[in-house]
């Protein structure tokens, strides 16, 4: 289970809110996996996929509007992570493998989220909020 204290905060409240919503969904999926509730897991995984699509799309739109210099790199990481999530959802829908899903939801995804927020989202939020240029942090 992820704890709110584990989520790094960035310079934009809207991004922090989105990350918190994602953490809550991940925790609900973790609970459903522990309970071996296939139907609930399926519904929640679909919700996480939709939330992630909207989350990444919103960030990417802000980056394009503000002409964020490392946009292609950030978008590429979103595409990779979204592809991985789609694969996890497809595998779940085919096999209902609780053990594989538990590893992804309990380890892989939370670790990626924290790392992504600490690096790419922090630089992005700082730029979008006018705090600092990503180029001054070596991201260009």
Model-derived features: where do they sit?
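Small-residue-biased structural context
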Residues: 1-140
């Amino acid at each position: 289970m992820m704890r709110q204290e584990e989520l790094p905060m960035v310079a934009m409240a809207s991004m922090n809110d989105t990350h918190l919503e994602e953490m809550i969904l991940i925790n609900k999926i973790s609970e459903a996996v522990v309970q071996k509730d296939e139907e609930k897991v399926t519904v929640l995984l679909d919700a996480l996929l939709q939330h992630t699509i909207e989350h990444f799309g919103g960030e990417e739109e802000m980056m394009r509007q503000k002409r964020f210099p490392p946009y292609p790199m950030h978008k590429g990481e979103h595409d990779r992570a979204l592809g991985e999530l789609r694969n996890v959802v497809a595998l779940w829908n085919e096999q209902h493998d609780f053990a594989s899903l538990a590893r992804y939801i309990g380890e892989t995804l939370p670790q990626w989220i924290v790392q992504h927020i600490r690096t790419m989202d922090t630089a992005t939020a700082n730029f979008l909020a006018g705090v600092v240029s990503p180029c001054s942090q070596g991201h260009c």
